[in-house]
Curated annotation (Swiss-Prot):
Subunit annotation: Component of the TREX complex composed of at least SUB2, TEX1, YRA1 and the four THO complex components: HPR1, MFT1, THO2 and THP1. Interacts with HPR1, YRA1, and YRA2. SUB2 may mediate the interaction between the THO complex and YRA1. Associates with growing mRNP complexes during transcription. This association requires the presence of HPR1. Also interacts with SAC3.
Domain notes: The Q motif is unique to and characteristic of the DEAD box family of RNA helicases and controls ATP binding and hydrolysis.
Organism field: Saccharomyces cerevisiae (strain YJM789)
PROSITE patterns in alphabetical order: HELICASE_ATP_BIND_1, HELICASE_CTER, Q_MOTIF
UniProt short sequence motif Q motif, positions renumbered to this chain: 62-90
SUPFAM superfamilies per record: P-loop containing nucleoside triphosphate hydrolases
Keywords (A to Z) from UniProt: Acetylation, ATP-binding, Helicase, Hydrolase, mRNA processing, mRNA splicing, mRNA transport, Nucleotide-binding, Nucleus, Phosphoprotein, RNA-binding, Spliceosome, Transport
Protein's recorded name: ATP-dependent RNA helicase SUB2
EC number per UniProt: 3.6.4.13
GO MF terms, alphabetically ordered: ATP binding; ATP hydrolysis activity; RNA binding; RNA helicase activity
Length: 446
């Protein structure tokens, strides 16, 4: 395989359509605006080209029932308690269920995962022993979570099998599962390195793939080694397939790289990129000395009302030490970081998700995509160095438009500079946390 980097990417047409959505304007505009006109233009183009992807449901569908999904999917959606699609689901699902390629940037917690899970399940006609759907993501925990979403929405589709593959586990077990027609999956969720290894060793046949999804695509494609892995996997799939890419952040530099994998994609950008802050999330900072962090953290955990909290630190050592300190101070906590064994990480993630513990101390391994609905408080014990990573971190609280609270400790000149960059990048004012505290109703759901 060539190592020429970007030049080695497959050249696909990037004659894309684009939908820019500003949430406030979309709310005012109701059922008019750029989304409708762009969709009409796409319908005309497809008609002229003899597109076989089917007719579209109106892009401003207001309920999941308007998407005309399979009865099995509709039942599962009702069981999950979902009634109305989020903004990103409303604008994407009507076309994605018919096989249109998608490039989607939307803030954390707006239901991007459900877009590709529902779209691929809607199109899936399972054939024993054939992989029809491939989903690639950058983190093992995220792969595990996506697999769980597939299980949740396919509960009334008993013939559909889903498997998750990631590094750190014996590849022989994956090979055994794939070889057996009784266990061979129709849907594969995987990290790039492990899936590439399965392809190279011919343990997996991707010649029947109809849907190719990359979640957190900016993170997957910005690292050259990971991008090369994806290219090798991509080449093992048919040329005629649907490709969908999703992320909360998509820089101008990464977009052309994404587009090379796509054919005439629908581009959805929910809210202007500079305003990717989370609706319903209260954001504050606390200025303090490094030595004051532990005392202030204990005070916050005592004073604030929360269901679950995630506390971000900058290193594995600090994660372990802070967790020990919290447990010794009668704050039962669990820690998750990248240096523990894979089985242990998954077990701890599951324990936290199942509400066995209310406090989790983590490095950035939990900073992207991980969706635990009870988290309504995120604390940056150590502030991140990157503005985009701040968004992913605080996005763990206030998922899918719910309320939440994010507090960042600022203890150095570097932290102050990062805070200024965050406010400039996302066009948001982050206030100093009031000494008297804040009203719980501003960050707690009724």
């Amino acid at each position: 395989m060539s190592h020429e980097g970007e030049e080695d990417l497959l050249e696909y047409s990037d004659n894309e359509q684009e939908i820019q959505i500003d949430a406030s304007k979309a709310a005012e505009a109701g059922e008019t605006g750029a989304a409708t006109s762009a969709t009409e233009g796409d319908n005309n183009n497809n008609a002229a080209a003899g597109d076989k992807k089917g007719s579209y449901v109106g892009i401003h569908s207001t309920g999941f029932k308007d998407f005309l999904l399979k009865p099995e999917l509709s039942r599962a959606i009702i069981d999950c308690g979902f009634e109305h699609p989020s903004e990103v689901q409303q604008h994407t699902i009507p076309q994605s269920i018919h096989g249109t390629d998608v490039l989607c940037q939307a803030k954390s917690g707006l239901g991007k995962t459900a877009v590709f899970v529902l779209s691929t399940l809607q199109q899936l006609d399972p054939v024993p022993g054939e992989v029809a759907v491939v989903v690639i993501c950058n983190a093992r925990e995220l792969a595990y979570q996506i697999r769980n979403e597939y299980l949740r929405f396919s509960k009334y589709m008993p013939d559909v099998k889903t498997a998750v593959f990631y590094g750190g586990t014996p590849i022989s077990k994956d090979a055994e599962l794939l070889k057996n027609k009784d266990t061979a999956p129709h849907i594969v969720v995987a990290t790039p390195g492990r899936l590439k290894a399965l392809v190279r060793e011919k343990y997996i046949d991707l010649s029947h793939v109809k849907n190719f999804v990359i979640d957190e695509c900016d993170k997957v494609l910005e690292e050259l080694d990971m991008r090369r892995d994806v290219q090798e996997i991509f080449r093992a799939t048919p040329r005629d397939k649907q490709v969908m890419m999703f992320s909360a952040t998509l820089s101008q530099e990464i977009r052309p790289i994404c587009r090379r994998f796509l054919q005439n994609p629908l581009e959805i950008f929910v809210d202007d990129e500079a305003k990717l802050t989370l609706h319903g999330l209260q954001q504050y900072y606390i200025k303090l000395e490094e030595r004051e962090k532990n005392r202030k953290l204990a005070q916050l955990l005592d004073d604030l009302e929360f269901n679950q909290v995630i506390i971000f630190v900058k290193s594995t050592t600090r994660a372990n030490e802070l967790t020990k300190l919290l447990n010794a101070s009668n704050f039962p906590a669990i820690t998750v970081h990248g240096h523990m064994k894979q089985e242990e990480r998954i077990a701890r993630y599951k324990a936290f998700k199942d509400f066995e513990k209310r406090i989790c101390v983590s490095t950035d391994v939990f900073g992207r995509g991980i969706d635990i609905e009870r988290i309504n408080l995120a604390i940056n014990y150590d502030l991140t160095n990157e503005a985009d990573q701040y968004l992913h971190r605080v996005g763990r609280a206030g998922r899918f438009g719910t309320k939440g609270l994010a507090i960042s400790f600022v203890s150095s000149k570097e932290d102050e500079e990062v805070l200024a960059k965050i406010q400039e990048r996302f066009d948001v004012k982050i206030a100093e946390f009031p000494e008297e505290g804040i009203d719980p109703s501003t960050y707690l759901n009724n």
